[in-house]
Design a protein with these regions (language model features):
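Glycine-rich, basic loop-to-helix element that forms the pyrophosphate-binding segment
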Residues: 71-87
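Acidic helix N-cap motif at the loop->helix transition within catalytic regions
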Residues: 18-21, 48-57, 104
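Short aromatic/hydrophobic "clamp" motif used to bind/position activated sugar donors
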Residues: 92
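N-proximal low-complexity "stem/linker" segments adjacent to membrane-targeting elements
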Residues: 1-29
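Conserved short acidic donor-positioning loop in nucleotide-sugar-dependent glycosyltransferases
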Residues: 15, 27, 44-45, 74
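Conserved donor NDP-sugar-binding/catalytic core segment of glycosyltransferases
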Residues: 104-138
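Short, flexible, basic/aromatic active-site loop/helix in glycosyltransferases
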Residues: 142-162
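A conserved acidic beta->alpha catalytic loop
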Residues: 26, 43-52, 99
């Protein structure tokens, strides 16, 4: 029998093996003890070397409890739903395959859900990072829209009605996902549609 994990980190990926490995690098220094969390990477039918890169990565970093599952239905919503279905944690945290997280990232989600049983879902800041200078078309408005940056500050508060979490950096209790059925696959990022 597999040991129980309290928190599952779900990462959907499609043809971004190099970026995924950079994301995984940021998980190696998490302050939450490794026995409390797992990583479920969902390969959304990649056609490049993403699966091979991931396999090499987990061999090189056996301390990371990470596995990859395949989702052939294209779209981030279908991929995230598969990751949730394959996960074991009571708390489910979602990030994108190009995000880097701070060392306290998972510990903060874990502590929030453990100490506030009334909280069913939570989200946090996403600060864009660029490999070079930001593209010229990137304004503060497009940065907020594309990166999902909605900064409500450092203290916990109820999420404003009519607002929604950005692409990555949000988490749920498994019971909440079960109650509402996961992500709507008719909205996922496929082709020209940008909602998940």
């Amino acid at each position: 029998m597999m040991p129980e994990k309290r928190l599952s980190l779900v990462i959907a990926t499609y043809n971004r093996g190099a970026k995924l490995c950079t994301t995984l690098d940021s998980l190696l220094v998490q302050t939450l003890p490794q026995e409390q969390w797992e990583v479920v990477v969902v390969n959304n039918n990649s056609t490049d070397d993403t699966a091979a890169r991931f396999a090499d990565y987990v061999v090189a970093h056996p301390q990371l409890d990470a596995r990859m599952v395949l989702e052939t239905e294209q779209g981030v919503s279908a991929a995230r739903n598969r990751g949730i279905a394959e996960s074991r944690g009571e708390y489910i945290v979602v990030i994108d395959d190009d995000e880097r997280v701070v060392p306290e990232f998972l510990e903060r989600y874990y502590s929030l859900f453990e100490s506030h049983p009334e909280v069913g879902a939570a989200g946090g800041r996403i600060l864009p990072g660029f490999e070079s200078v930001p593209p010229r078309w990137m304004s503060k408005y497009t940065e907020r829209t594309i990166a999902g940056t909605l900064d409500l500050g450092d203290r916990m508060r109820e999420f404003p009605e009519g607002k929604f979490f950005g692409g990555g950096n949000h988490g749920y209790r498994r019971a909440v996902v079960g109650r509402y059925g996961g992500y709507d696959t008719s909205l996922g990022r496929t082709g020209g549609v940008l909602l998940a």
